[in-house]
Regions:
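Extracytosolic ligand-binding ectodomains
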Residues: 2-16, 25-424
Length: 424
């Protein structure tokens, strides 16, 4: 079932407002004259929030994506700090509650969501892993709470029935898959093997890479999916090696540290075959004995590198070494806060009904204080964030995005190029 479009959301909100107004009408038989009735502009729909915007974070402190946690938490912390420095939301400071998303095994995320519910959060930032998010999306959105991920890229979220309460600031893997497939072909490779996690994230991205490679005339030497819970990857690595690829796309998480040595042992490691990583396994591997020099990878990045923004993040967390998804986390919080102001209500349903509106088709603004002033003056806004344009399509995902192309020298990577595009 495809999620509600913007028009349907508006209809739902109007219907709900009508029910609220009729329920509050009392038992009087006297109908007021039209001339005595206040106009729509003179009245406000009843609010459901308690006046305090509470935001929870469900981000990785442990698990396969723990390396992404620090920049994401820093983005959330910085946004809330700046919002509160500018007067908060609806006249009160935003409250923050942190939780651990884990990696889905065991089910850490579910119990952590319960803790956030006990904290009475109106919105949750997270999770980072698409597989974790899909495991809790029904629980969160079913409770009338906004779920807003800074890092989910699985294409499946675009058609997920989420009560109009799931959003993200990272572009769908339809874009990353296209960029990665094009990159391999442009690099001169025509017989590419794909090895990917068999989960909500891995399969979707692998399918998009495969489609792009074939569209560009390349052959997919083999398409190998492996269990995310596997203890070893011998059979899958043997299968990939047997296909004799000239390049390998490895769509993985932390298990990359186990797979690379096996690829090397079979003669298809980084020194023998061109390897490509993705956002899930682009990390600092300085503690590993293998050498990744020449390996390339893709990851959603801000439209432009903003050193001033990174400096502000370092003030929040001086230990930061990586800024992946920090801007997207920051923007997720900002958009939620601005949507609450636009709604005049901090409840999840009210925020969800206004999130898309504050990202497009209004007066452009880029700071919370500037955007807040415009909203309080009755203007529609188009928030331009730290990650770039945040314009959302009707599914609650970015309508466009930028994918950074990274390359390893030793076991650390640097950005060598970036490709921006519309998410089709």
């Amino acid at each position: 079932m495809i999620r509600s479009t913007r028009a349907r959301r508006a209809a739902i909100v109007l219907a709900a407002s009508a029910l609220v107004l009729s329920a509050c009408g009392g038992d009087s038989d006297d109908e007021p004259d039209a001339s005595d009735s206040p106009s729509a502009s003179e009245t406000k729909a009843a609010t459901k929030g308690d006046g305090v915007l509470r935001i929870g974070s469900l981000l990785p402190q442990t698990g396969d994506l723990a390396f992404l946690g620090p920049p994401e938490f820093a983005g959330v912390d910085l946004a809330i700090q700046e919002i509160n420095d500018a007067g908060g939301v609806l006249g009160k400071p935003v409250e923050e509650f942190d939780a651990d998303s884990g990696d889905g095994t065991p089910d850490i995320a579910g119990s952590e969501v319960d803790k956030l519910f006990n904290d009475k959060v109106d919105a949750i930032i997270g999770a980072a892993a698409s597989g974790v998010s899909v495991s809790v999306i029904d629980k969160i959105t079913g409770a009338g709470v906004v779920q807003f991920s800074p890092a989910n890229t699985a294409a499946g979220f675009d058609t997920y029935d989420d009560n109009g309460l799931y959003f993200r600031t990272a572009p769908s893997d339809r874009l990353q898959g296209q960029v990665l497939g094009n990159l391999a072909v442009e690099d001169g490779f025509s017989n590419v093997a794909i090895m990917a996690r068999q989960d909500f994230y891995g399969e979707g991205l692998a399918d998009q890479v495969k489609a792009t490679l074939e569209e560009k005339g390349a052959t997919v030497a083999d398409f190998v999916l492996y269990s995310a819970d596997a203890q070893n990857y011998t059979a899958e690595v043997n299968q990939v090696a047997a296909s004799k690829p000239d390049a390998i796309v490895l769509i993985a998480f932390e298990e990359t540290t186990k797979i690379i040595p096996q690829l090397i042992a079979k003669g298809v490691g980084p020194e023998d075959v061109q390897l490509y990583f993705v956002d899930g396994n682009l990390a600092d591997y300085s503690d590993e004995s293998f050498d990744l020099t020449g390996v390339k990878g893709t990851v959603p990045v801000p439209a432009e590198i903003d050193e001033a923004f990174n400096e502000r993040l370092l003030e929040v967390d001086p230990k930061l070494k990586d800024f992946s998804y920090s801007a997207q986390s920051y923007d997720a919080v900002m958009i939620i806060a601005l949507a609450a102001i636009a709604a005049g209500d901090d409840s999840g349903e009210a925020i969800g009904a206004h999130i898309i509106d504050v990202t497009r088709e209004g007066t452009q603004c880029s700071t919370f204080e500037e955007c807040k002033t415009l909203l309080e003056d009755g203007e529609d806004i188009d928030y331009e964030g730290a990650s770039g344009p945040t314009d959302m399509n009707d599914t609650g995902s970015p309508a466009s995005g930028t994918i950074g192309i990274q390359e390893y020298k030793g076991n650390k990577y640097t950005q060598i190029d970036a490709v921006s595009g519309v998410v089709n």
